[in-house]
Amino acid sequence: MSGLKIVVIGGGSSYTPELIEGLLNRYHEMPVASLWLVDIEEGKEKVEIIAGLARRMIAKAGLTIEVVATLDRESALRDADFVCSQFRAGCLDARISDERISLKYGLIGQETNGLGGFANACRTIPIALEIAADMERLCPDAWLLNFTNPSGMVTEAILRHSRIKAVGLCNVPVIMQKGITTLLQCADEKEVVMQVAGLNHFIFVRQILHKGKEWLPEVIAEINAGRDPLVPRNIPPFRWPSHLLQGLGMIPCAYLRYYYMKDDLLRQELAEAGGEGTRGEVVKQLEKILFDQYRDPHLAVKPKALEGRGGQYYSEAACELMNAIYNDKRIIMHVNTRNNGAINGLPDDCAVEVSSLITASGPLPLNVAPFPEDTLRLLQLMKSFERLTIEAALTGNRHTAWRA
């Protein structure tokens, strides 16, 4: 069997070295013949820098993988096996603009929540569907792994408006799993079974099993005591009100602070915008540092500075998912896929982020116990926002946008 052809849309992203590292670590199970890094004219220099680093990393590993950097998406997609989507429509300047406009009007300016998430989705979804249409023609059997934000809305748009095989990914469940493993003082995170359910950046940990025992109450107690390693680097680590977690009986992901602790987060964002800058401005400076390192002809590993990006572990999750599909691993991962009844009270055709069994045929979402009514209403409200946003992005209808 010949090796795999893997295509990365947004190949000039600073995250790509983590993806390459993950592919190299799994080469014995998932042999890659060629890696195509696709970008646009504005990203031409970055994608060439990434391609150079990729070749050095591959050589250091003693492997032979063709690396192609290109602006020609069509030639890249032809006969691909897996396509990873990690592009940012409008680049970081658009994100910064979203943040600044939101804060100007006293609103949270986060790239996947509220006004910022809406604007990002409207820019991104039409491009994502263009890519999906290209895949229908050029690689109809390929899997699309989407971690372009807002991942849940982008994934749902693709699932509902194209015929390709697609799965959405997020690093938040990965970070939560690693954090819970730390709290349980467990050496191997694979021994910890975590069930999550909800929407992208709106998930709840519903169950934690280790060696046959339920540990959710103990982990909640640890978090309430001030030990919370479940927070990504890009989210302010405000302490949850203890009554909230006790009342929920679940662990909300860090992004739910934007809803349960909105006023605190808004004050923090306003203070940061007046000081070191918005998150987008901070990331822009970090990317300059990263690409200065990536240019170094002696660098042949993923630099530690990459851990400063909030999306740490996105690429790790992507490689694990590719491996699970390719080898029919039948492992549990937490992905964005069609609901199909997994969460009662949400449409069957909508995208949800749930624990799923990953097979060669894709993810099989695991049914979850009914949510408490108050939490379900929040999920339904957010899903209505997402579906109206998708409709507005595809139709350009201003009235639909206002409804969202």
Residue ranges and their predicted role:
Residues R78, C84-S85, N146:
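Redox-cofactor binding/interface segments in oxidoreductases and associated redox assembly factors
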